[in-house]
Amino acid sequence: MEEKRPTLCIVAGPNGSGKTSTTMQLLHYEWTENSLYINPDNIAQEQFGDWNSPAAVMKAAELATKMRYECLEKRIDFVFETVFSSDEKLDFVRKAKENNFFVRIFFVCTESPEINVKRITQRYLNGGHEVPISKVVSRYYKSLLNLSLIHISEPTRPY
């Protein structure tokens, strides 16, 4: 009998694209029902008290990274959100594939970084977390580049 492959579901895209809204819908599907959900924004708010504090955000990112690698090691199904603008995330997808994870990538994006900036501003005015405009713009283009690189280099299932 063949061992069940663990599943990694990544919801990726630039800041302010709607990753969390998309993830909330995906978490209702049968194939994610037993998955651990790792979200650095939630970790910053719930465990370190403030998602607008640079120190809390840094601690949350470190904890989320640790949790992701533990899931790989223990072969646990999991879902995580990422801006997908760092090379580390590309390496992580490769490691998951090497560990025989079934990888699904849902890429959420708007048609321009200006739209993302407006969405983030509205989110902040409604009590959410902010992201500096310069980071929104640079991450927007880097995440698109990384999506094209992962699609070319790794047989994944992007949506």
PLM features per residue range, with description:
Residues K19:
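Conserved lysine of the Walker
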Residues F101-N146:
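A glycine- and Lys/Arg-enriched "phosphate-lid" helix/loop adjacent to the NTP-binding pocket
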Residues M24-K74:
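Conserved substrate/cofactor phosphate-moiety recognition/catalytic segment
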Residues M1-R5:
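Phosphate-binding P-loop
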Residues P14-N15:
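The conserved Walker
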Residues K59-F107, S143:
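Glycine-rich phosphate-binding loop used to anchor ATP phosphates in small-molecule kinases
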Residues I150-Y159:
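Single conserved hydrophobic/aromatic residue that forms the stacking wall/gate
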